[in-house]
């Protein structure tokens, strides 16, 4: 069987990472196999180890990609608004939406991976990627809070982002029951009523 070109190998690797990024968000870091990822990428599973030394190496890269995608999406939403409150709402409203709840493969990696991180060693590379991603998103969200007190803004960012992640996680866990929509609505209403300078 002929070897693929370097360009094709790079393209295949990119396809694998994108497929894994989506699948890990949908099913969790430990809810899929190498065979699942390669099938989603449209490739045979035998080629996996030509690209990655282990499933864990792929998980680290794919989770990093998921955080990059979220951070870029937030950056674009923030840049589209002239004032902090409108920008803040542009993060909250889609995050706490039915679409976000029902499409985990395209939404927040924190809500998708938090449960898995409870079982990761504190010094694992995967956990480090997760912590860096959370820090990046928290800083982005916190940049929209302008009380004039940096420590108070940091604390508020921690509370509000935790509420967003928790509400999305609970809404997913209760999907199919009316309480799922209630959770999203209540959290979204509460957060948008706060304003960015309170």
Each language-model region and where it sits:
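Hydrophobic alpha-helical segments that form the core
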Residues: 109-114, 151-173, 186-190
């Amino acid at each position: 069987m002929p070897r693929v070109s370097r360009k094709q190998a790079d393209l295949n690797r990119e396809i694998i990472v994108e497929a894994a990024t989506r699948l890990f968000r949908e099913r969790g870091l430990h809810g899929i196999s190498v065979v699942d990822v390669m099938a989603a990428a449209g490739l045979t599973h035998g080629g996996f180890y030509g690209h990655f030394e282990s499933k864990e190496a792929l998980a680290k890269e794919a989770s990093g990609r998921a955080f990059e995608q979220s951070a870029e999406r937030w950056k674009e939403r923030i840049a589209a608004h002239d004032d902090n409150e409108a920008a803040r709402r542009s993060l909250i409203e889609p995050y706490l939406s039915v679409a976000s709840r029902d499409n985990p493969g395209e939404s927040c990696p924190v809500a998708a991976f938090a449960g898995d991180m409870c079982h990761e060693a504190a010094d694992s590379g995967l956990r480090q990627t997760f912590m860096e991603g959370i820090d990046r998103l928290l800083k982005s969200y916190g940049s929209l809070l302008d009380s004039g007190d940096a420590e108070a803004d940091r604390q508020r960012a921690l509370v509000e982002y935790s509420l967003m992640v928790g509400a999305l996680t609970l809404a997913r866990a209760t999907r199919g029951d009316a309480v799922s929509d209630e959770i999203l609505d209540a959290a979204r209403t509460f957060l948008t009523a706060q304003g960015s300078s309170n």
